[in-house]
Structures are given as C-alpha cells and as structure tokens.
C-alpha cells in the first residue's frame, strides 16, 4: 500500500508522515481498499491500517473471497532496536517507547480481528519471515 500511496501522492512515505500530509489517511484507505479487491497478489498494509473501520471491512471482504491474512509482529525490544529508539534523545521528545507500546497494543487488537495467523519476526531473518508467510499462505507445494 505504501508504494501505491507514494506513487499517487508523489512523495516518499516518510515525507508524507512527518509532514502530516492531509491526504495521507484517505489515500492509504483508498489504496488499501483497491488493492484488497484484486483477485491475486500480496498486499502489505501498514501496522495501523486495520484500525480504520473501512480498511478492516475491506480485509474481511478479501478473506471471504479466499485471501489469507498474515500479521507480521515483533516484540517491543525488536521494534525499538529496528527503529533506533535506544539512542539518547531529548527529554522534550517524551517517551517514544511508551507511545510505541500503546500503538503496538492497538494494532495487535485490530489484527486479532482480521488475521488468520501471526508470524513473529522478532528473531527471524527476512528469508525466514518469507518462508513462514509462504507456509501460512500455502503458496507452493513445498509448504
């Protein structure tokens, strides 16, 4: 979805988020709905997208048409490491780990309602994650 949003809005996702582009939420919802209507392929949603009721409904519709929904998760330690939240920062920036913890809880609840399975990526390599997703989706006879 991010790539479709970037293409449509003509800017990198980081710029759109940091700049709080007012078109971002609606465009992300529209692109998620459009991509989830396709009959084949892999759609990668942002972690918070199932929190949007229209997107959650589109995910449910895709599941009724046979789509498999796989949530990719990671523990707080892994996400903090990946996002460099362990580096020193100004006290004025607040508590990013606390904010992240709350966001992760919200996303987890939303995904519980729509995901068929969850792959914990905390200690897996990208190839291992791909293998687990392929296995969950039964994409090849090997799985």
What spans do the regions from the language model cover?
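Short, flexible helix/strand-to-coil boundary loops that buttress conserved ligand/catalytic motifs
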Residues: 9, 17, 36, 63, ...
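K/E-rich alpha-helical interaction surfaces of small helical-bundle regulatory domains
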Residues: 14-22, 105-116
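Short, flexible loop segments at the rims of nucleotide/cofactor-binding pockets, characterized by
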Residues: 19-23, 46-47, 94-98
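Glycine-rich phosphate-binding loop used to anchor ATP phosphates in small-molecule kinases
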Residues: 23-68, 72-73
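Short amphipathic alpha-helical segments
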Residues: 54-57, 81-84, 131
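A glycine- and Lys/Arg-enriched "phosphate-lid" helix/loop adjacent to the NTP-binding pocket
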Residues: 64-110
């Amino acid at each position: 979805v991010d790539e479709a949003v970037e293409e449509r809005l003509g800017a990198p996702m980081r710029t759109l988020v940091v700049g709080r582009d007012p078109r971002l939420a609606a465009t992300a919802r529209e692109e998620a709905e459009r991509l989830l209507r396709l009959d084949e392929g892999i759609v990668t949603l942002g972690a918070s997208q199932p929190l949007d009721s229209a997107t959650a409904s589109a995910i449910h519709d895709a599941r009724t048409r046979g789509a498999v929904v796989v949530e990719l998760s990671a523990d707080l330690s892994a996400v903090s490491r990946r996002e460099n939240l362990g580096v020193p920062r100004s006290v004025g920036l607040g508590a990013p780990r606390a904010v992240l913890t709350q966001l992760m809880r919200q996303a987890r609840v939303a995904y519980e309602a729509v995901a068929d399975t969850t792959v914990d990526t905390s200690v897996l390599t990208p190839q291992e994650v791909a293998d687990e997703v392929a296995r969950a989706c039964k994409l090849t006879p090997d799985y």
